[in-house]
From Swiss-Prot:
Gene Ontology CC annotation, any one: membrane
Annotated Gene3D superfamilies: ABC transporter type 1, transmembrane domain (1.20.1560.10), P-loop containing nucleotide triphosphate hydrolases (3.40.50.300)
Name this polypeptide is given: ABC-type transporter braE
InterPro entries in alphabetical order: AAA+_ATPase (IPR003593), ABC1_TM_dom (IPR011527), ABC1_TM_sf (IPR036640), ABC_transporter-like_ATP-bd (IPR003439), ABC_transporter-like_CS (IPR017871), ABC_transporter_C-like (IPR050173), ABCC_6TM_D1 (IPR044746), ABCC_6TM_D2 (IPR044726)
Record keywords: ATP-binding, Glycoprotein, Membrane, Nucleotide-binding, Repeat, Transmembrane, Transmembrane helix, Transport
PANTHER family noted in UniProt: ABC MULTIDRUG TRANSPORTER (EUROFUNG), ATP-BINDING CASSETTE SUB-FAMILY C
Molecular-function annotations in GO: ABC-type transporter activity; ATP binding; ATP hydrolysis activity
Job of this protein: ABC-type transporter; part of the gene cluster that mediates the biosynthesis of the brasilane terpene glycosides brasilane D and E.
Limits of the ABC transporter domain: 594-823, 1224-1477
Species whose genome carries this gene: Annulohypoxylon truncatum
Glycosylation sites: 367, 671, 813, 1207, 1232, 1330, 1364
Binding site for ATP: 627-634, 1260-1267
Higher taxonomy: Eukaryota, Fungi, Dikarya, Ascomycota, Pezizomycotina
The keyword Repeat belongs to this UniProt entry's keyword annotation: yes
Membrane topology listed for this record: Multi-pass membrane protein
Amino acid sequence: MLFSACADTNDQSLGPNVLGCRGDFDFTVKFEQLCFSLTPAAIFILASPWRVAHLVRKPTIVGAPLLRLAKLGVLVSYASLELSQLILITVLPFGASGIDIISSALRLAAALCMVGLSYFDHSKSPRPSIFLSAYLFFTLLFDIAQARTYWLASSTRPEIAFTAIFTAALAMKIAMLLLEAQRKTKWVAWDSKDHSPEETSGIYTLGVFSWLNKLFFDGYHKTLGIRDLYPLDQNLAATHLSERFSRHINEAKRKGHEIGLMEALAKTLYVPMILPIPAKLAAIGSFFCQPLFISSLTSRLSQSEPVPANIGYGFIGASICIYSVIAISQSLYWYFQQRLLYMMRACLATAIYTKTTEARAADEDENASLTLMSIDIERIMKGSLYMHELWGNVIEVALSAWLLYNLLGVAFIAPIVVVCICVGGVSFFMRFMGDSQRNWMAGIQKRVGLTSSVIGNMKNIKISGLTSPISRFVEKLRVDELQAGSNFRLLMLTCSVFAYIPLLLSPPITFGVARRSLDATKLFTSLSYLLLMSTPLQNLLETLPQMAAAVACLGRIQKFLQGEGRDDYRIFLAGSRRDPEKPSLDQLDKSPAVAIKDGSFGWKPDKMVLNNLDVEIPRGSLTIVVGPIASGKSSLCKALLGEMPHSQGTVTIATKFSCVGYCDQTPFLSNGSIRDNIIGYSPFDAQRYAEVVDGTMLGIDFETLPEADRTNIGSNGITLSGGQKQRVSLARCLYLQSDLLIMDDVFSGLDADTEDQVFQRVFGANGILKRRQATVVLCTHSVRHIPSATHVIALSTDGTVVEQGTFGDLVANQSYIHSLGVKAPSTSQADSEKIESDDSAIEPQINLIERAPTETPEVGVNDKSRLSGDSAAYIVYMKSMGTMLPIAIFTSGLLYGFFYNFPTIWLTYWSADAVATNPSHSFGYYAAIYAVLEVCAMLSLIWLGVLLYITVLTRSGVSLHHAALRTLIHAPLRFFTTTDQGIITNLFSQDLSLIDNELPSALLNVIYMVFVGIGQAAVIASSSPYLAISYPFLFGMLYVVQKFYLRTSRQLRLLDLEAKSPLYTHFLDTSKGIVTLRAFGFVSEDRAKNAFLLDTSQRPAYLLAMIQQWLHFVLNVVVAIIAVMLTSLAVRLRSNSGFTGASLVTLMSFGEMLSGVVIYYTALETSLGAISRLKAFDKAAKTETKDGEDIVPPEEWPPRGEIILNNVSASYEYELPLFLSIRLTTNELSSNDTQPETPTLALKNLRLRIRPGEKIAICGRTGSGKSSLISLLLKLLDPIDETLDCVNIDNTPLSRIDRVTLRQRIIAIPQDIVFLPDGSTFQENLDPSNVSTAADAQAVLEAVDLWDFVRDKGGLEAGMTVSNLSQGQRQLFSLGRAVLRRRIRARSLGLGGGGSEGGILLLDEVSSSVDRETEKAMQEVIRVEFREYTVVAVSHRLDIIMDYDRVVVMEKGEIVEEGNPARLVEEPGTRFGELWSVGGN
């Protein structure tokens, strides 16, 4: 035995309390040796080699030799003292036991390990050693307790000597702790990147979150922007994590494991997953000290004699230690856990994006990755937050059950039975949660996908008059989504009820079963054990559904990641791909640039689109591919790019460069400047840039654009005309350093003059591509350029090659090419074109306008409402609920607060009556009322949950979405040209997700915790009225903390939401343009951009999580202060043991309630930020409807179709410029309210009278104002105020007509066709308004020659996939939609199916992507179906214009000529005549 003073006591037992010695207020020596010395030292010794091995591989980045020398000196001294203790134990007559010697030896070994660990950690790590500091901190507390024991137990000289050396070692450990805590920031050899102060923070700085102080001060005093935030810790960076994660996920994919994604995460993040465990164990230990402390204190207070001073100070010291350790261990646990979550987010988001770049081009849902990256990852993070609670709660339940058994005997089985029933109930309902969540996520995915499509195509939707049916479709998806979500939330609510049963019903059931004398000590100790059992069970049962949801979302992501990716089947000859620096020139020169042998390609394995192709494309040639619509021209382009999912035969590519220039039929443009879109990720070359701008004739357009080539083109290039989009896409293709270019119908939106000039400058004999000796594959409907081709390929409708060869040979074959009637240009014409080409080659005709780009301020930075919040958001949310629901919610919260807290007071009366000589009431009386109170608490909680999670959520969700969608639909076109698509998409995804999920949860928890907290404060004060005196000061401090915290928290939450918008936009852009990105070889750069955007979005989100943990820590410190005050008052004033027990038991959860009130109030405030953003959206996107638009014409309007424009002018700039920035947050959303002094006019002084039934064609070069004229007639573009009433239709001022009604009455077909989401039926797409019969739809499809196609796909009710339709078929489908509208209108007006008295048809390049035969068929349909309509058609096909009554030629927004097209062609010097001749007619 080490000490002999207490030889006759239980000092050599495990105790843990010593009896008969040291005032019975100490641990036994054996317990201290085992738990305070031996166990920590053994753990440290086992873990140290692993840490040292990890550090040895890292580079040396810290100097500071003096600090390192000081550390080593102290450690050597400490090791010497430990050695001295071991010698004393073994040499002197202590009578030491084996555990004493082992404990001392392990302490010495641990000291030696500390020397090596400190040396390497000092040099290799930028932060103080977390592992060593944690060991020093906790063992220091243990050593202080042991030192006290040793001094009290020492009675002989050897014992005193041993204790003195132990105390000296303790002093050395304190010195070492202080030295090891020193930050090494000024000695770290950083790289060039900025670093966060977190990266140099030690465990103490991390534990109290002092590294966040600067952020809090900044957030309190100013409005934060992204630039004000700390840089992201490099260990959380996407590039740092993704490389390791991709290796593990690829390995899991090869093995085909069902939980491969979870395995990959575990292998990648195993160290971050382990780090929370020690802190969690420390927290569990400190939790279980609370009931022991309550038992000891109430036992002392129930005795008649006063509490001795030293024991009273011991109780106070114990309360300080217990609650301080709880605060620090909890903060460290959640710190490491939050870091883990954001590492998981980085891994998953990067993997999803990478898979998006590898996905097949034919994948139907391009928005799937966006939903997975946003909604699914958020739910995974929410569920994974509690992963360590799973095993931690099991330990807590087991320990509390064992302690309860020691106190109450077999009665401990009662709560276990309750727990088993609840676990069974939760397990039963969890079986349905996976499918329920998948249905809900699928509903969100459908709605967000459609909304994103609507945002990107709003102009065409408005032109088509489809705003109302599409709004109804989106709202139906929203209702379906909320219904699916309600089913899931109902399951969650049911599981939550089961989770609260142990907390509320276990105590009355347990006490009822015990039926023994229960004094205050037993009653409140038992209650504390039950609380320790039921609280983790409640957490466990509540979090199990969230964990199940996280697993389901991981399954969805794994399915996506394991989906079949693109398989590039092409064969690249040496030099073209593998070694671009050293091409095999001889081999390349002898082989064709592209060769297809026995090639068959298809989008589905059972149906090939292209069949039996044998094609060779000569090097340096211009190969033109022609054929009727749906012959496979676009599919051939995809086949050459390796993008067809199913292929047979071989495709061989032999080029010098690894990248391929590609122009898609639908131009892919990102939201940025024209220059950025042209250059992409290529290095800037001014000469090359000027060359391609001149070749595509964009210089002329730059002169009319407000910022020239730095003009922002908006999402999908919405600010550009169709021809401008095509030419920007062509310029990007030409700018790329490539010798193989594949172009799909790049002339579809160009007028004849521009088309001819672009062709000569780019493809002509001395054009850009000829000079570069590039190989060009050009698929086109513009057959007049075929004579210029080196090689021609003609495809048939069955996907085979009809003929191929030179133009002359094919004309002589008397086959398809001959049937087109195209003639080779005359010698004089060819010479003229050559001279033109030569001139342009010598002197590029371009004058690049170097204008300084407009500085767009970081909007919102000076928005003071970001500091104080938006109180109006509460009103909006309450209004969305209705009148009675808020009252019902408040009432249910009040009832729950009472019924939750009063049972604790009831136990005080029960315990007092139980020990009374003459009890006032029986056991059953108290037990029954106690049970009724708890059942009432349960019922009020259920009521509150149903109100908020089901009723309120559904009602407000529908209402707020309807308001936001209405704002979106009625927003002016200018709004969509100045606002990034990702920002608006974020409103309908992230913000509505907040309103659906976080907002109801935050509101419920605030109501729940406020009323419970008020009751708990009253219960705590019941032990001593003096404690209540401190409440004003405590609550004042809480108010200051909340105010201080909330300013920063609210801003970080808003920044979190805002920083995700660019990430979402980038995901959408990548999904839409992946074929182009892969062809250009830009995928790696695009992934780097995604990593940057992801890291940027992580910064506010991660810091928000950290400051929430700071708040937890501060409030736990407040609880510690209350505990110390309560203990001090109890032992000094001899408080009632029952009320003291009730106060201490309540205090066990009071900290959580305090934290919860502030945390969830902040969550409520920041979640209401979503509503503020919707309010700001409503304000910024002011409705396009203006005062005075009060005329709703009758159904038959316009009966005649007469249009009069009387000197009208219009400007896009004249509308209020709404520069909606990424900070779409508050009512003070910045917008530029100043009108430009001289707005650029899109239309100038137009004078035009279109007679009823007249057929008018509009032509002119691209950007001349043709589409703007269509927009003017549909009120997408408003006249300037001076000419507001200068447009009339059938004698009705256009300015007075309701816009929605106007677009429904006028039938219009846009250039870009709008379809419902994939999976919608052909019938729904043809008739979104659902007013026709199947027979009507079939008749229309037969009229436009699409019925056979639809029938082959399964008929009208079959699901439709837009990618299965060629561009020409899409335009035919759109024409069919217009024909159906005309027929339904005629029938509703009683005019029969053959025609109507009048109407207006507007056509915007409806035949730009079809061949001549199809175009003639379309014009015949228009002539027959709309013979009595007034037709205004924008067209570049001049031969079709000849059939119109009149042609209007436009230039720079003005009408420069009008007249009969045939007469204008004959007259010399006319503009139309020039266009006619240029067009090769």
